[in-house]
Amino acid sequence: MANAITFFKLNTGAKFPSVGLGTWQASPGLVGDAVAAAVKIGYRHIDCAQIYGNEKEIGAVLKKLFEDRVVKREDLFITSKLWCTDHDPQDVPEALNRTLKDLQLEYVDLYLIHWPARIKKGSVGIKPENLLPVDIPSTWKAMEALYDSGKARAIGVSNFSTKKLADLLELARVPPAVNQVECHPSWRQTKLQEFCKSKGVHLSAYSPLGSPGTTWLKSDVLKNPILNMVAEKLGKSPAQVALRWGLQMGHSVLPKSTNEGRIKENFNVFDWSIPDYMFAKFAEIEQARLVTGSFLVHETLSPYKSIEELWDGEI
């Protein structure tokens, strides 16, 4: 099964696995087993972030997988992300060093700016009074230095609108390799998809199933009638069809699960496809962004006065 996985090519030349394991909201105590199961099933990309609070546990499992020769380090693609409290240029290398220590790695394959937002250093949680003016150019220069050092084999961004990505591409010496954003049949990101393709930036989808396990998001992505009709006709689960849709759209997907059965099911998306006439039906699905980033918006204290401003109208 491991051989069945397909890859995308990044603008660095690196091979980027088309399906990865998301670890957002994967509880400590469960995430390690999920990572071990996923790697044994054939996953070759683990998507992490410092703010998820589970990198130490993932690091311990990775170490064991390497020691037991289940997989070689060079055959795994590991992503992590710079949190909003570490955007000051002097804090960027320290943040990556902490992540590398926790993950017990010498390098990450991809390091992303998690959000285009800055929060006061040392803040716990996100309070409006701790939001600071954003300076992406300075932060990006520090990211480029990490790329130069080899500690981050590729660098990129997450939650960037088309405009924010375009602004960054104007000034970047090392262009971002990836923009990781919410993307699923109920939030297709058509404009951003087209822009990324035109600029050689790979779009990677978090919440490709609409985060069904998340309590604070109202998500009906997997209940969509069109998705379910296609799933029934193809003899697949709605989750498999949502993931396969993403691959056929030309982007990678990062489904999160700590259930071994679902981890396996989510990986079984390579040896079949959605026929064109069914694929066309997805254009009829009503669109709604789930992760609005409202926690970064405040009418007086934030650089983003509205959700429209945070996403530059892409809502």
Curated annotation (Swiss-Prot):
Under the heading CDD domains, the entry gives: AKR_AKR4C1-15
Q: What induces it?
A: By drought, salt and cold stresses.
As recorded in UniProt, its EC number(s) are: 1.1.1.-
Its Gene Ontology biological processes? Answer: response to cold; response to salt stress; response to toxic substance; response to water deprivation
* GO terms for MF: alcohol dehydrogenase (NADP+) activity; aldo-keto reductase (NADPH) activity; NADP+ binding; steroid dehydrogenase activity
InterPro entries named in the record:
AKR, AKR4C, Aldo/ket_reductase_CS, NADP_OxRdtase_dom, NADP_OxRdtase_dom_sf
Pfam families of this UniProt entry?
Aldo_ket_red (PF00248)
PROSITE patterns annotated for this entry? ALDOKETO_REDUCTASE_1, ALDOKETO_REDUCTASE_2, ALDOKETO_REDUCTASE_3
User: What does it do?
Assistant: Oxidoreductase acting on a broad range of substrates: reduces ketosteroids, aromatic aldehydes, ketones, sugars and other aliphatic aldehydes, and oxidizes hydroxysteroids. Aldehyde reductase that catalyzes the reduction of the aldehyde carbonyl groups on saturated and alpha,beta-unsaturated aldehydes. No activity on alpha,beta-unsaturated ketones. Can use propionaldehyde, butyraldehyde, methylglyoxal, (E)-2-pentenal, (E)-2-hexenal, (Z)-3-hexenal and (E)-2-nonenal as substrates, propenal (acrolein), crotonaldehyde, but not 2-butanone, 3-buten-2-one or 1-penten-3-one.
Q: What is this protein called?
A: NADPH-dependent aldo-keto reductase, chloroplastic
Name of the gene = AKR4C9
